[in-house]
Amino acid sequence: MCTMPLMKLKKMMRRTAFLLSVLIGCSMLGSDRSDKAPHWELVWSDEFDYSGLPDPEKWDYDVGGHGWGNQELQYYTRARIENARVGGGVLIIEARHEPYEGREYTSARLVTRGKASWTYGRFEIRARLPSGRGTWPAIWMLPDRQTYGSAYWPDNGEIDIMEHVGFNPDVVHGTVHTKAYNHLLGTQRGGSIRVPTARTDFHVYAIEWTPEEIRWFVDDSLYYRFPNERLTDPEADWRHWPFDQPFHLIMNIAVGGAWGGQQGVDPEAFPAQLVVDYVRVYRWVE
């Protein structure tokens, strides 16, 4: 009798199908490129097929409990198994209600900064979101350095692949912030989509970032586009589109905060988990 957990078995089946598709794509590389259609090519991934802490070759941590510019309540810990761990084929980021370093909650904020960054590409994350008032999971991107303007943020941009706030369950948001378009001015640009099973089932949250635009998807359903105005408006500049430089990935659960805590925090909602099946990054090949 098979005793393998159903979730892990399904993951292995998806992983096998994914590897077959990659192998087929690789076998085509030897063919005449004039006959090969443009496509997305995998360049980086974490399938979480191991156990323990997140792979230190791929992930680092943002650490601290200073509110993170959003009046957040959690302390982000470093390499603490209670807050970030891999097992059963998934990554679990867990926010907990517990005293730690002067804060009432703990969580983790994983980053690829210093490990991997990209300019343009398709970024694909299969995840199940946490429940509960006061939870604020996010999968997003920030630039590696300050290239434009007098401030790192918002001058150099932010790409929110997926955000969800617990007081507005099953509504997923995709947003950009720039010098011209940001929440401090009330001018941020983005879209939202209802995902009725976001907290009970896994869904694929993705963006496709090109020199022309950024596109947001849930399960390959397009729900928002942000165009590069510098290509059509002679007055537009980096203030409108700073997205021509390397960005790194971030995954976290915040607690409370200016947005996530608008209707308070329910302590009974914790521990709360953002569960990630995989993270995949592709580049466009002509």
UniProtKB/Swiss-Prot annotation:
Name one process (GO BP) from the record: carbohydrate metabolic process
- GO MF terms held by the record: licheninase activity
Q: How does activity depend on temperature?
A: Optimum temperature is 85 degrees Celsius.
Q: Which CDD domains match?
A: GH16_laminarinase_like (cd08023)
* Substrates-to-products reaction catalysed: Hydrolysis of (1->4)-beta-D-glucosidic linkages in beta-D-glucans containing (1->3)- and (1->4)-bonds
Keywords, comma-separated and alphabetical:
Glycosidase, Hydrolase, Signal
Instruction: Write down the SUPFAM superfamilies for this protein, in alphabetical order.
Output: Concanavalin A-like lectins/glucanases (SSF49899)
EC no. given is 3.2.1.73
Signal sequence span is: 1-30
| InterPro entries cross-referenced by the UniProt entry | ConA-like_dom_sf, GH16, GH16_AS, Glycosyl_Hydrlase_16
Q: According to the UniProt record heading this chain, what is the dependence of activity on pH?
A: Optimum pH is 7.0.
> From what superkingdom does this record's organism come?
Bacteria
User: Mind telling me which residue stretches traverse the membrane in this protein?
Assistant: none
Q: Where is the active site?
A: 158, 163
Annotated ranges, domain GH16: 48-286
User: Per its UniProt entry, what is the enzyme's top EC class, as one word?
Assistant: hydrolase
Under the heading PROSITE patterns, the entry gives: GH16_1, GH16_2
Write out the similarity annotation: Belongs to the glycosyl hydrolase 16 family.
Sum up the protein's function in the record's words: Shows activity on lichenan, beta-glucan and laminarin but not on CMC cellulose or xylan.
Q: Could you tell me which PANTHER family the record lists for this protein? A: GLYCOSIDE HYDROLASE FAMILY 16 PROTEIN, GLYCOSYL HYDROLASE-RELATED
| Record-given protein name | Beta-glucanase
